[in-house]
Amino acid sequence: MRQIPFRTGFGYDVHRLSDGYELWLGGIKIPYEQGLEGHSDADVLLHAVCDALLGAAALGDIGVHFPPTDMAFKGIDSKILLERTCQLIREAGYEIGNIDATVAAEAPKLNPHIPEMRRVMAEVMGIPISAISLKATTSERMGFVGHREGMAAYATALIAYASALE
């Protein structure tokens, strides 16, 4: 059976905001009075991107490859998880086309940080910065995001069989 060379994936992640944690989003530290709780550095954006990539390649999800029960990943920098995810994608015979992601957070304002997040993500992923679109939104003070209890991120990824691009 013939397979179409392009595949899309979707990723979603949430983490609780808490005192005593640093806020890491898109691979950068963002000044804020709270951070996100998690087994790793809780970078909700990079986790959603990892899930989108893994989903596009039908390789499971971030919990399969980097389980929260494994102490090797305790406190790990999520840029390492993203780098390893990109390696898995390429080892499976794919190239990454683009990423489109949105972070939902009531505060802090994220738009000033988006250019640096894109730069860092492009460097880690080995793709052009033009292949990464990031947006930030609020939830209009509704739900757990709106009540400043946590943050959420949504991501899509496009990948293609490397052989189809030759």
Language-model features and meaning:
Residues 145-164:
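C-terminal edge-of-domain segments
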Residues 1-6, 161-166:
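N-terminal charge/polar-biased segments
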Residues 128-131:
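Short acidic capping loops at alpha-helix termini that bridge into adjacent secondary structure
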Residues 134-138:
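Pyridoxal 5′-phosphate
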Residues 9-11, 140-143:
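Glycine-rich, charged/polar anion/phosphate-binding loops
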Residues 111-112, 141-145:
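Short active-site-adjacent structural elements
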Residues 2-115, 120, 125:
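RNase III-family endoribonuclease catalytic core
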